[in-house]
UniProtKB/Swiss-Prot annotation:
<feature type="signal peptide">
    <location>
        <begin position="1"/>
        <end position="16"/>
    </location>
</feature>
<feature type="compositionally biased region" description="Pro residues">
    <location>
        <begin position="306"/>
        <end position="317"/>
    </location>
</feature>
<keyword id="KW-0677">Repeat</keyword>
<feature type="compositionally biased region" description="Pro residues">
    <location>
        <begin position="51"/>
        <end position="183"/>
    </location>
</feature>
<feature type="region of interest" description="Disordered">
    <location>
        <begin position="15"/>
        <end position="317"/>
    </location>
</feature>
<feature type="compositionally biased region" description="Low complexity">
    <location>
        <begin position="289"/>
        <end position="305"/>
    </location>
</feature>
<feature type="compositionally biased region" description="Pro residues">
    <location>
        <begin position="32"/>
        <end position="44"/>
    </location>
</feature>
<keyword id="KW-0325">Glycoprotein</keyword>
<keyword id="KW-0964">Secreted</keyword>
<dbReference type="GO" id="GO:0005576">
    <property type="term" value="C:extracellular region"/>
</dbReference>
<feature type="glycosylation site" description="N-linked (GlcNAc...) asparagine">
    <location>
        <position position="46"/>
    </location>
</feature>
<dbReference type="InterPro" id="IPR026086">
    <property type="entry name" value="Pro-rich"/>
</dbReference>
<keyword id="KW-0732">Signal</keyword>
<feature type="compositionally biased region" description="Pro residues">
    <location>
        <begin position="204"/>
        <end position="288"/>
    </location>
</feature>
<protein>
    <recommendedName>
        <fullName>Proline-rich protein 2</fullName>
    </recommendedName>
</protein>
Amino acid sequence: MLVVLFTVALLALSSAQGPREELQNQIQIPNQRPPPSGSQPRPPVNGSQQGPPPPGGPQPRPPQGPPPPGGPQPRPPQGPPPPGGPQPRPPQGPPPPGGPQPRPPQGPPPPGGPQPRPPQGPPPPGGPQPRPPQGPPPPGGPQQRPPQGPPPPGGPQPRPPQGPPPPAGPQPRPPQGPPPPAGPHLRPTQGPPPTGGPQQRYPQSPPPPGGPQPRPPQGPPPPGGPHPRPTQGPPPTGPQPRPTQGPPPTGGPQQRPPQGPPPPGGPQPRPPQGPPPPTGPQPRPTQGPHPTGGPQQTPPLAGNPQGPPQGRPQGPQ
C-alpha cells in the first residue's frame, strides 16, 4: 500500500513538473519577445494589454502554473484514499464473520429454546397428574352417591310415614260416617284406592297379629324403597301392593264391617287420631326396624280402636 502511494505521488509530481517546465518555457519566451518592437502589438493581442503589463501578466500565469501542482497534491490524497477505501472494506469482510458470531449465539439459543420446551413436555405428564386426581374424584363422587343410595332407604323410611299418612285417611273415614256426601268427593279420587285402602286399613285392624308383619316387609322395601316411590306417584296404586298384604285383610274386612256401624261415632275420635298419625307414622318407621316389638305396641293401639271404638262411639251415642 505504501509503495502504491509513493508511486502515485511521484507520478503526480512528475506530471505536475512537466507542465510547470512547459509553462516556464512559454513564460520565458514571451518575456524575451517583448523587447522587440513587434512584441508590443502582440501583447495587446494576447492579453489586450500593452508591453509593460505583459510582464505582469506572465507573473500571474506562473502562479497559475504552481496551482496545478497543488491540484495534483489533492489528487494524490485521492489516490491513497482508494487504498484506504479497501481498508474499510476488509473490516467489512471481518464483520460478516462477526455477524455469524451473533448468529451462532442465535444457534445456541434454539437449544435453550428446546430446553424450555422439554419442561413443556414434562408439564403434560404433570397435567395428566391433576387429571388422575380428577379421575379419583369420580370414584369419590360415587362414594357420595352411595351415601345418596342409602339415603333412599332412609328416605323410604320417612316415606313409609307418608304411607301411614293414608292412615291419616281415617280423616276421610270420619266423613264415611255422617259426611259421606263430602267423603264421596274424596272417595271418587280415592275411588280406586278405597279398594286397596280399606285393605290396608283392614290389616291395620288385625295388624296386632299380622299387621306388624306387613310393616316388617316395609322394612326391607327401603332398599326397594324406590318401588314405594313409584307407588307414591300413584298412591292409589300404593295400596294395591298392600293388597298383597290383603291376605290378612281377608280377616280385617270382617272386623271393618263391625267398624261400619261405629263410624258415625268412631270417626269423631278418629279425627283426633288423624292429626296424631303424622306423629304416629314416625314411630311406625321405627316400628319397621323393631317390627317384632312394634307389633306388640301396635296391637294394643289397633285393638283399642277395634274393640273400644265400638264402646267409645256407644258412649258418645
